[in-house]
Regions:
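Short S/T/G/P-rich N-terminal loop/turn motif that feeds into the first structured element of a domain
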Residues: 1-51, 55-71, 78-106
Length: 106
C-alpha cells in the first residue's frame, strides 16, 4: 500500500468551505481513481493548517492520479488554500484500520 500526504495552508476562516469542497468535489473524484483506497483529512485547531493522507493500492496508481487528476483537485481547492500544497509520498508500513502488515525484508 502507498500513501500521499498533502500539506495545505488554509486561508483565514475557510475551514467550512474547505470541508464542503472536499466532500462534494474532491472525494467523488478520488473514488473514481483506479487503486484509491481511502482519504483521511486533518485540520489544525487554529483552522489555518490541514493535511490529507490518501491511501492507494500501489505507487503506480497514486502517480497516475498525481499526473492526471490532482491538478484538477488543486484547482478546486485554490479558493481556500494559500500557496502551493506540499506533496510527499510514502510506502505504508502498517495500518490497523486497513489490516496491512509490511513485508518482511531481509
Amino acid at each position: 500500500m502507498f500513501a500521499r500526504k498533502v500539506y495545505m495552508h488554509l486561508k483565514p476562516n475557510s475551514v467550512p468551505e474547505f470541508t464542503q469542497r472536499l466532500e462534494k468535489d474532491v472525494l467523488p473524484l478520488l473514488r473514481k481513481q483506479k487503486g484509491f483506497q481511502d482519504e483521511i483529512t486533518f485540520v489544525g485547531q487554529g483552522g489555518t493548517e490541514a493535511f490529507a493522507i490518501s491511501l492507494w493500492d500501489k505507487a503506480e496508481n497514486a502517480e497516475t492520479y498525481n499526473r492526471g487528476t490532482y491538478p484538477e483537485v488543486a484547482k478546486i481547492l485554490a479558493t481556500v488554500v494559500e500557496g502551493t500544497p506540499q506533496v510527499e509520498t510514502y510506502d505504508v508500513a502498517n495500518s490497523t484500520f486497513h489490516k496491512i502488515a509490511a513485508a518482511a525484508t531481509a
